[in-house]
Amino acid sequence: MKVHRLFPRFFHFNPLHSVFNLMSMADSSKISLAFPGRQLLGDKKVCVLAGDVGGTKANLAIFEATAGQINLVKTSTYHSGQYPSVIKIIQQFFQENPGYQPDRISLGVAGPVFEGHAEITNLPWIIDKKEIIAETGIQYISLINDLEATAYGLAGMEEKDFLVLHPGESGIRGNMAVLAPGTGLGEAGLFWDGQVHHPFATEGGHADFSCRSADDMELHDYLLKDFKVVSWESVIAGPAIFDIYNFLLQVKKRPENKQISRAFKSEDPSAVISEAAIAGTDHVCMEAMKYFVRYLGRECCNLILKMKATGGLFLAGGIPPKIIPLLKQPGFYENLLDCDRMQDLVKKVPVKLLLNDKAPMIGAGWYGAYYLSSK
């Protein structure tokens, strides 16, 4: 059985403290994540079934942990839409892996979590902590938002898991933020208390989209046909790419490329559009992605300002790693800095792209091992 050690060599572990230190985004100064239950483990070993449960897929994993080390020992991926509930996915995992007997379950879920109860934003699922206990017999269950799990997952990342989009200014400590466009749009913060960072969830992706130009207003009015409220998720999540493309055809009267339209019938339209934009083979696709990247830059700026995220912003989710060439073009950075009188602050903030798509699953594992122990 292959075991993956999730204890990068640049972590500095003091058994007397329940924090993990990792490399700063800008230089060799350190930032830290708080795990208050870790010191309570001592030499005890715990087995955690951890999961990242989203609208498209669910990544499940087994972690084994002591106070000094956490190991990833098994992973499986499932298509969420093919199952009626997360319980069925967990049961499928246990059927496929009968040799594991976890004593706790920790799930990062794509939706708001209240008192052990969560509704998946882009699936007709309700996840209930009590139901999981009843169905599995496992008493220690945690449900956290998937972006909060992503933030905790930073503890298990190495330098190779990041791509610097903007280096910012070195040596600045402070709050941090995570923004993740995928099936939906997730946002989270990490509060800096002067010693360690504490991740927390938000639902900022559902805040109102703000229009600045006539083009923005036209797109807003077009989207209102399908959305009661046009949110930031309406313009910078996966489905938004196809919506923006159709807006350009129907409202802006851009010429339709029949080859692109045929590809939509057998492939994910958003992927077709972004790939054509990167390749430079279709002008309408290129224009659609310019809209998308512009709005992504603006919302990154918004999140930095609202969190006062001087410690850095992590760009996560399924889409950014697939459009790296577009993020390296001037449009993203120009819109990142295009704010009201706070350009000097935003310019100092490091921005990194998180390349490891298992970060939410890993974060759920670390939370289950080292935070749930304090409950």
Language-model features, listed with the residues they occupy:
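ATP-binding/phosphotransfer module of carbohydrate and carboxylate kinases, centering on a glycine-rich
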Residues: L6, F10-Q101, E218-K375
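Conserved phosphate-binding catalytic cores of ATP/NTP-utilizing and phosphoryl-transfer enzymes
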Residues: D27-D43, L143-M176
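Short beta-strand-loop/turn "lid" adjacent to the catalytic site in phosphate-handling enzymes
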Residues: N97-L143, A151-D161, V178, K322-P325
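Glycine-rich beta-strand-to-loop/alpha-helix junction loops that act as flexible
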Residues: L107-G111, P181-T183, T310-P320
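Glycine-rich phosphate-binding loop of actin/hexokinase-like ATP-binding domains
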Residues: D161-E233, G238, G331-L337, R341-Q343
